[in-house]
Amino acid sequence: MSFSYTGFFLQYHAHITYFWRMVLTAELLSPNLMQLFIQTGWLEWCGVFTGILCVWLAAKNNIYNWPIAIVSVVIYLFIFFDSKLYADMGLQVYFLIMNAYGWYFWNKTKNATHERPVSTITSKEILLSAAGIVVFTYGLGTFLYKNTDASFPFVDSFCTACSLIAQLFLARKVLQNWLIWIFVDIIYVGVYISKDLYATALMYALYIYIAAVGYLNWRKTYREQNN
């Protein structure tokens, strides 16, 4: 089994360019592409709906994002296994744990005298996160490349590593979690198009917008806290 970074990124660029051209020119309504969405299974549509809803609620600082997120990650456990995106499948297990933690953490602070404030990332957290992403990507990517038939083992592992950090920061109400999500979601759009998961790719395209809204909302809250 061989893996070519050049081949992947050329393919990724072609897919992502085509996808956004269709979105921006309303070609999503063309018969051929509509047929692709029609062929999308009901399970993926359920994952898309719950995924978008939970991220939108998180952007609005709403605690009910967590139980809906739990439903979404369980659905995507099965979807990613079927698509041989094993790093993403493993990521859902982590998300399941972190969603339960986030639900508990937010509920605990909600019931306290003061709501948990939005915080910003520290220099130490940046260094530790960067180091963790590099080590995790190399370790998991190498394992998947040598031992499985995973699609895009290193790219998938890199996105998984970034997502681990972003999810932890989301649960801890760190403002910059949204910037990490924007970066990762842009990559994920191309990956999922490459695997013919068009509804999921569209969901992640919407995630980019929602993450931008979330960042602006949380930044406003952070500034109000410090005035």
Model regions: which residues?
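Structural signature of hydrophobic alpha-helical transmembrane segments
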Residues: 36-45, 88-97, 149-159
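Short, strongly hydrophobic alpha-helical membrane anchors
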Residues: 3-42
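Membrane-interface helix caps and helix-loop-helix hairpins in membrane proteins
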Residues: 81-88, 143-151, 171-174, 193-198
